[in-house]
């Protein structure tokens, strides 16, 4: 079962596509830099799960990730 639930995620970001792309991009950041964690405790051990938890908690928003310049 997906944790956090999809309805909790869609309450933060309307589009399922935007949730998926935001989670994927944030998961790559977490994978590359584990110290970039924004929460003190995660339920999931995998980067995608951690990214979804951050979205559900309202810590990560699509604009922050897609406007970032590399």
Curated annotation (Swiss-Prot):
GO annotation, biological process: DNA-templated transcription
EC number: 2.7.7.6
Pfam families: RNA_pol_Rpb6
GO cellular component, one term: DNA-directed RNA polymerase complex
UniProt keywords, alphabetically: DNA-directed RNA polymerase, Nucleotidyltransferase, Transcription, Transferase
InterPro entries xref list: DNA-dir_RNA_pol_omega, Pol_omega/Rpo6/RPB6, RPB6/omega-like_sf
Keyword Nucleotidyltransferase: yes
Domain of life: Bacteria
Catalytic activity field: RNA(n) + a ribonucleoside 5'-triphosphate = RNA(n+1) + diphosphate
GO molecular function terms noted in the UniProt entry: DNA binding; DNA-directed RNA polymerase activity
Presence of keyword Protein biosynthesis: no
Annotated SMART domains: RNA_pol_Rpb6
Role, per record: Promotes RNA polymerase assembly. Latches the N- and C-terminal regions of the beta' subunit thereby facilitating its interaction with the beta and alpha subunits.
Family under the similarity heading: Belongs to the RNA polymerase subunit omega family.
Subunit structure, as described in the record: The RNAP catalytic core consists of 2 alpha, 1 beta, 1 beta' and 1 omega subunit. When a sigma factor is associated with the core the holoenzyme is formed, which can initiate transcription.
Protein name: DNA-directed RNA polymerase subunit omega
Organism of this sequence: Staphylococcus saprophyticus subsp. saprophyticus (strain ATCC 15305 / DSM 20229 / NCIMB 8711 / NCTC 7292 / S-41)
Highest classification ranks of the organism: Bacteria, Bacillati, Bacillota, Bacilli, Bacillales
């Amino acid at each position: 079962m997906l944790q956090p639930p999809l309805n909790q995620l869609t309450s933060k970001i309307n589009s399922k596509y935007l949730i998926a792309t935001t989670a994927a991009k944030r998961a790559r950041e977490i994978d590359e830099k584990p110290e970039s964690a924004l929460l003190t405790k995660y339920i999931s051990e995998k980067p995608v799960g951690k990214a979804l938890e951050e979205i559900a908690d309202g810590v990560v928003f699509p604009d922050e990730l897609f406007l970032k310049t590399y």
